[in-house]
Design a protein with these regions (language model features):
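Short, Lys/Arg-enriched N-terminal segments with co-localized hydrophobic residues
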Residues: 1-15
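Short, charged N-terminal beta->alpha structural module
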Residues: 13-43
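Structural signal for conserved beta-strand scaffold positions within catalytic alpha/beta enzyme cores
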Residues: 20, 52, 92-95
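Gly/Ser/Thr-rich loops at beta-strand to alpha-helix junctions
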Residues: 23-29, 74-76, 98-101
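A short, well-structured beta->alpha microelement
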Residues: 42-60
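Short, structured active-site "lid" loops
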Residues: 61-84
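Ser/Thr/Gly-rich flexible loops in soluble cytosolic domains mediating phosphotransfer, phosphorylation
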Residues: 89-141
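Glycine-rich phosphate/pyrophosphate-binding loop and the adjoining helix
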Residues: 141-153
Length: 153
């Protein structure tokens, strides 16, 4: 594979450049269109950039990204790929229920938290504690909100 992903060293509070990847580009393009509309409506479009790509072309992206978020249907492709190919940028598997929520705040919060976790352990894909069994993940809110809700129970 051609390694052409540009990595933007993300710092907390910075703008966030996100690449959302799916198998054929269809569901990622729908998600990105919806999220970009939410960014525009909330006034955050100048602060964050979200784009999409097909799984097989994610290495050819020219924009510098802080994080790559993989749609749930790419899970099996990720398992078959050489994970050592991507070491310098966090790869985050979007939980299935979070993926269908189409809510920008949830995606941005998970993006920030995944970047922060990746900086501490440099493991790809990024899984939050207790979510390593990816296909069993039923979370539909951001991980930080999920954690807060568990504390309040």
């Amino acid at each position: 594979m051609n390694k052409m992903i540009w990595y933007d060293e993300h710092k907390d509070g910075d703008d966030m450049n996100i690449l959302i990847v799916c198998n054929n580009g269809c569901s990622s393009s729908v998600l990105v269109k919806r999220l970009n509309n939410e960014l525009m409506a909330s006034g955050l479009s100048k602060k964050h950039y979200i784009d999409h790509a097909q799984f097989m072309f994610m290495y050819q992206q020219k924009q510098p990204y802080d994080i790559i978020m993989l749609c749930p249907q790419t899970y099996h492709e990720w398992l078959m790929m050489k994970k050592d190919d991507i070491k310098d940028i966090p790869i985050y598997m979007i939980p299935p229920k979070l993926f269908v929520s189409f809510v920008i705040e949830k995606m941005l919060e998970d993006g920030e938290d995944a970047i922060h976790q990746f900086k501490s352990d440099h493991k790809n894909p990024v899984f939050f504690p207790g979510e390593e069994a990816y296909m069993k993940n039923r979370r539909s809110v951001s991980y930080r909100k999920f954690k807060e809700n568990k504390k309040n129970i």
